Amino acid sequence: MVDEITNETAQTVAAGQLRAFIERIERLEEEKQTISDDIKDVYAEMKGNGFDVKAVRAIVRLRKKDQAERQEEEAILDLYKAALGMV
């Protein structure tokens, strides 16, 4: 009898935890979508003000990397461009 009660309690607790995790994920997904929409709006505003959005996206990607990583990528790119006669 005690084992049945303990098992039921454990299942109830596990179900409650699962529900809480799922609801938390759902809230975060909603926030993520809102943030994504806000970012799209900023890019649209930039485009409307004459900025090249493709270039801005490239700058944002570069700013996420540390300086050493950026320099290494640029060196490799320069090497490949030179090998192909593009510089």
From Swiss-Prot:
It comes from the Bacteria. It holds the Pfam family GapR_DNA-bd. InterPro entries: GapR-like, GapR-like_DNA-bd. One of its GO terms (molecular function) is DNA binding. Signal peptide: none annotated. Belongs to the UPF0335 family. NCBIfam families: PRK13694.1. This is UPF0335 protein Meso_3367. It comes from Chelativorans sp. (strain BNC1). The lineage of its organism: Bacteria, Pseudomonadati, Pseudomonadota, Alphaproteobacteria, Hyphomicrobiales.
